[in-house]
Amino acid sequence: MSEPWAAQTQEQRYDELLQQTGAALIGAAPQSWRRIDLIAKIAEGVQDFGLTVIMSDFSHAEVDPPAGAAQALVELRRLMYRPERGAWLSARYVLNPPGEFRIFYNYEHDPLWEPPIPAAVFQRDLATFPRPAEKVPGWLRRLVEQAGGSPS
């Protein structure tokens, strides 16, 4: 049984990581941005971050995803892992001025890595973040089985 303080500490860390992500994104964006949209695809040992910054005139600014946001999201994924559900496969962090954000987590759908990552990466990810067989999406099960592994 977990202690109430442990849950509170986890919630506090969750909030801190989301704030760190937002602060890093705002710090990397040019002045007069209208929306910041970060897509994070994370598997054990592999990460891909795509950042879109829309300016007030609706143009797009070329901005590299900041390392601080990437590090916070990698830690957030570890923190959010639950054995009964697994770890999320991708997340989308959308930020609007002055600092209002929403985050969406994908636990089921193929994050469509480009280029595709090897099945061995997903096998490693499932070994690090196991989930019950019924929580392994069909696309992921097929991919891991085709590579000769077991998805659960």
Report residues per predicted region.
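N-terminal "first-domain core" detector
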Residues: 1-53
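Short, flexible domain-boundary/linker segments around small modular repeats
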Residues: 1-24, 63-78, 120, 125
